[in-house]
Amino acid sequence: DLLLSTRLSMTSGFSSRIDNVGELMNKGYELSISGDLIRTNDWKLTLNGMISQNKNEIKKLYKGNDISVGWNNLIKEGYPINVYKMVRWAGVNPANGDALYYTADGRITNTYNSNDAVVLDGKTPDPKYFGSFGANLSYKGWELAADFYFSGGNYIYNHIRFFTESDGAQYGNNQDKSMLYDQWKNPGDITNVPKQSINNSSYQSTRY
């Protein structure tokens, strides 16, 4: 089952409801271990660890229709849940400082078009693995514990960069220093920061 909030007509008196919109397959493993490294009348030291891996895939959606989630994510048959869909960043034109993007069919252009957004296979904000490890030390009724958590294998859209690297569009707000020091200035400059202009805009793309 795949339970999601779906919109309703406002004439119903409700804005949304939870519906079963498809089929989701989850599979993976979890391994945990715990043991006493030291055990005496006064002292006890216990170590523990856990790691988990999960893989999911959308097997079926109602009428096969894709579902947009937030700004850049998509629920689509045959892909992991929340897979990214966005326009691909192609760098900066060294001749004139224009921002460059890939079209849906792979050509390079200096014109941003949201219709050129493509599914980024295998790239989601959801961790591919996560886990924890820790220790617990006790002595005559006193106890000290520490736990650490980790995750990885996922891709996070950097919204801070989206707002602080606006290429001049948000000149009245705080901007990253790279906008000043690394920006394109002269023909032939090789950089990943386009020329600065108040007419620019920070578009949603794989740049961030």
Annotate each PLM feature.
Residues 47-53, 137, 146-150:
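Transmembrane beta-barrel strands of outer-membrane/channel proteins
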Residues 151-208:
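Extracytoplasmic gating/loop element in the C-terminal half of outer-membrane beta-barrel translocons
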Residues 19, 24-25, 29, 36-125, ...:
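Conserved small-residue
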Residues 31-35, 133-139, 146:
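Residues on the lipid-exposed face of transmembrane beta-strands in outer-membrane beta-barrel proteins
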Residues 6-16, 106-117, 192-205:
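Flexible, solvent-exposed coil segments and beta strand-coil junctions
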Residues 1, 41, 141-146:
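Repeated loop/turn-to-beta-strand initiation elements of outer-membrane beta-barrel proteins
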Residues 123-139, 202-208:
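Outer-membrane beta-barrel transmembrane strands
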